[in-house]
């Protein structure tokens, strides 16, 4: 039996696992099997909070909405191409195809809107769990190349050249059915994005994986910038805790990072002389964009963003930056430099971290020669981080919220074994 897909529900109280022989649902605290079916090769599974409604992808183009309590099918939908991702909240059902996103009213299953996107084979997309701030985030569609565009010489004859995914994020209001902002998050293509439970914060990572950024939603102010590491790494999963004070990040390395989102003491209209005010004054524009004008902290593309009228001229940016002189030494020095250079003086590293155990080659998971993939979430009841890996293991790590530092593995289970209560506790309290 192979594990095809794994995900937490919106409040991290349940874990859903899709396999080649049905699917399983577990409670996370305490860890126990809640539901299981052994029929069907399930490609994708998504839950709606703690309800009995489950969305399943049974074949590449077919979606089934199921009531697990009644063991009945609510509806089935077939799409023109392969379904790459499914997102749910109490108002909307989102279906992500490679170049389209379908929005449904989850109460009536009526199709409300179809969004045309640039090719998005990795299904980079995030839907807020909030019914009030019901925002959808996805890569900004790229304009078609001009008629004079020449594809690379290595492109096969007759094929269509596809540009890399944008580093910009489009914020779409799924209640008003309109795009409301674009956030220029990275110069490199996006690799992972996530929204917090209130739909007020957006975390982004590019395909370099060295810098994690957090923006306010929907206005797009850059609030935090974190360094995961200096070497490139593929970001697999990012998750805010329920109070949005911590951000957990997993990648193709074995280290899981936790970053602290300390609330700024200054007001949103802070003076540009303060570090917070300086960041915000340079990250917002009249259109709500958040330009990335010089990321020299490890997430650097081959060139700057194309010049845009609302961003102003380069000399204008330098003049504005040179006027942002703070009271501290770092602020004084950084104020005379372009924003990307000044950010090198203020790197924000992880607050806590821990390393995953080495993959168990004898487990029933779909382990290959590539890096161990992982999905992370934080418990809403205890200071613990939950991690599910592609080899079928579920880990629980305890963290010290006051001191941070290295976390401790306390529990380990398998999501692929047949027992109702699985695994063992690493430490017996």
From Swiss-Prot:
Gene3D superfamilies reported for this sequence: YVTN repeat-like/Quinoprotein amine dehydrogenase
Annotated WD repeat ranges: 1-36, 69-114, 139-182, 185-225, 230-269, 309-355, 367-407
Matching InterPro entries: PROPPIN (IPR048720), WD40/YVTN_repeat-like_dom_sf (IPR015943), WD40_repeat_dom_sf (IPR036322), WD40_rpt (IPR001680)
Superkingdom as given in the UniProt entry: Eukaryota
Keyword Protein transport: yes
Ranges for region Disordered: 262-308
GO cellular component, one term: phagophore assembly site membrane
Motif (L/FRRG motif): 226-230
Keyword Transport: yes
Domain notes: The N-terminus might form a beta-propeller domain involved in specific binding to phosphatidylinositol 3,5-bisphosphate (PIP2), leading to the association of the protein to the membrane. The L/FRRG motif is essential for the cytoplasm to vacuole transport (Cvt) pathway, for the recruitment of atg8 and atg16 to the PAS in nutrient-rich medium, and for its recruitment to and dissociation from the PAS under starvation conditions.
Oligomeric and partner information: Component of the PI(3,5)P2 regulatory complex.
Protein name as annotated: Autophagy-related protein 18
Gene that encodes it: atg18
């Amino acid at each position: 039996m192979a594990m095809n897909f794994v995900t937490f529900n919106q409040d991290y109280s349940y874990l859903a696992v899709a396999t080649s022989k049905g699917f399983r649902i577990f409670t996370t605290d305490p860890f126990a099997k809640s539901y299981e079916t052994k029929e069907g090769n399930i490609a994708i599974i998504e839950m709606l909070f703690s309800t009995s409604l489950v969305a399943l992808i049974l074949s590449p183009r077919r979606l089934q909405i199921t009531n697990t309590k009644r063991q009945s099918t609510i509806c089935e939908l077939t799409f023109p191409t392969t379904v790459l991702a499914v997102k749910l909240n109490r108002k909307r059902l989102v279906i992500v195809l490679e170049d389209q996103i379908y929005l449904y009213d989850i109460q009536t299953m009526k199709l409300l809107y179809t969004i045309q996107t640039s090719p998005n084979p990795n299904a980079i997309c995030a839907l807020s769990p909030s019914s009030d701030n019901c925002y959808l985030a996805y890569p900004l569609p790229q304009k078609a190349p001009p008629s004079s565009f020449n594809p690379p010489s290595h492109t096969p004859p007759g094929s269509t050249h596809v540009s890399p995914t944008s580093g910009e994020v489009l914020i779409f209001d799924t209640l008003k059915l309109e795009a409301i902002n674009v956030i220029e998050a990275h110069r490199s293509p996006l690799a992972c994005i996530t929204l917090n439970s209130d739909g007020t914060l957006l975390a982004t990572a590019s395909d370099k994986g060295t810098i994690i950024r957090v923006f306010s939603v929907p206005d797009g102010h850059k609030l935090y910038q974190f360094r995961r590491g200096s070497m490139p790494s593929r970001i697999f999963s990012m998750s805010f805790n329920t109070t949005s004070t911590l951000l957990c990040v997993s990648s193709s390395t074995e280290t899981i990072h936790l970053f602290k989102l300390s609330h700024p003491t200054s007001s949103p209209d802070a003076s540009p002389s303060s570090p917070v005010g300086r960041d915000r004054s340079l990250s917002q524009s009249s259109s709500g964009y958040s330009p990335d004008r010089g990321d020299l902290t490890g997430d650097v593309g081959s060139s700057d963003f194309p010049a845009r009228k609302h961003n102003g001229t380069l000399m204008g940016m330098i003049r504005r930056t040179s006027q942002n002189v703070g009271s501290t030494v770092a602020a004084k020095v950084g104020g005379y430099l372009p924003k990307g250079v000044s950010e090198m003086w203020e790197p924000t590293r992880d607050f806590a971290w821990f390393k995953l155990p080495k993959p168990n080659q004898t487990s029933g998971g779909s382990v290959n020669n590539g890096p161990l993939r992982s999905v992370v979430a934080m418990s809403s009841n205890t200071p613990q981080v939950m991690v599910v890996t592609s080899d079928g293991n579920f880990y629980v790590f305890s963290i010290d919220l006051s001191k941070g530092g290295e976390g401790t593995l306390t529990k380990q289970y398998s999501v692929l074994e047949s027992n109702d209560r699985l695994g063992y506790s690493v430490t017996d309290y």
